[in-house]
Amino acid sequence: MRQASPKPEGLRERNRREKHEHITNVSIRLFLENGYDATTLAEIAYSSGISRRHLFNYFDSKDEILFSHLREYYEMIAESIARGSPGEPAMEVVRKAILSNLARFDAERTLAIAKIMKNNTALQSKNRANEINLEKAILRGLSTLWPDRESHDRLLFASILSSGAIRFATHIWLRDENEMKLADCVADAFDRMMFEIQCTQ
Amino acid sequence: MRQASPKPEGLRERNRREKHEHITNVSIRLFLENGYDATTLAEIAYSSGISRRHLFNYFDSKDEILFSHLREYYEMIAESIARGSPGEPAMEVVRKAILSNLARFDAERTLAIAKIMKNNTALQSKNRANEINLEKAILRGLSTLWPDRESHDRLLFASILSSGAIRFATHIWLRDENEMKLADCVADAFDRMMFEIQCTQ
DNA sequence: GGCCATTAGTGCACAGAGTGCAGTTTAATT
DNA sequence: AATTAAACTGCACTCTGTGCACTAATGGCC
């Protein structure tokens, strides 16, 4: 182990992270006020106090402003899965990883983004496209835990089912807003699937 | 019943369909030759013998050129599911609908498009986003078959699982190109899921 | 402190996707 | 033949995203 992982985080790194956060917040506010399509990158840049050109040093695209915060969350999931117990069924490992990382899930921001996506089918599609990254992260984690090549298809299958369960849970959670806690929705969705599936490992 | 459904298909309608097909073929050829990103709509229009502006009377966007042919296929699936037997488990109805419509699935075009998407992650994402339409179509079909509101969540769950199985099947089929028939891949994927799932209906 | 490499940040010009609009041509209907 | 709707074109425009050349700020190092 080389120097563990704390990393002192330099001033520059911190500034960057904070500005990244700032731009995201400004953007979400503008999206909520005027709609996603009607908000141009020029406006976002102006309201954030930077040049339009410089936006692309923080986000690769307009969509990324909404979805990039999920990237590190997905990465955490992958790592958490990789640290799971190989004796358990794959789905159970994923379930535990999701539930144990739920505290780090930014529910408030997700709710705001869901509001922005409402009535914008193009954005919903992009959101869906982004979910492929969750599935890939799950698969990556599972493949680390069970590196043998012959189990790859089984793990792919498990990652598809898992991300399906998560999507189902999120859907219920967003629909019955505030009626259920996200953790319960996720637990229910996995329960439902685990109950119906005889996970033969 | 008013006039049934045969519809004589007027000359105009037919011309439109043929031109639609023609543009698609031209585009796929260009995409294969020069890549998706490097092929502009202006080139496609020129090679198709129409104006760039007029392309948008056939396709809403560049992506649509690749994905629109799936639209009517998905619609067939939905109708086929809606005609299923309500006594069977939902997953079984979907499985039968997929398998019985497989002859109408344009495998050749799908292979070409898969080739185009290879090494283009943005396009893969868009492809993934498009799959939400299959899931919606499945859910639509199932909801027609079981219109009672209280089973909606169960049907949503089934549509997520089904489209997951289809995606798994397609993945295997594309990976082991020509090694297995698509029908077998689909059957296997559903078998696998139906075997592992105790479909309690 | 002063030098230096790196990173933050700007401005400009450009390409390509997609839209609105005003207009012309073509084809089906009566 | 006249009418009407659809096919089709051209133009000007907006917005996203990129390449490039450039300046400003910052951290490390002597």
Label each residue range with its predicted role.
Chain A
Residues 133-158:
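Hydrophobic alpha-helical bundle segments that form small-molecule/ligand-binding pockets
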Residues 63-65:
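A secondary-structure capping/hinge motif
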Residues 1-6, 140, 178-201:
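C-terminal peripheral helix-coil segments that are non-catalytic and often amphipathic
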Residues 50-59:
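Short hydrophobic/aromatic patch on the recognition helix
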Residues 1-34, 38-50, 67, 76:
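Basic, helix-initiating cap at the start of DNA-binding domains
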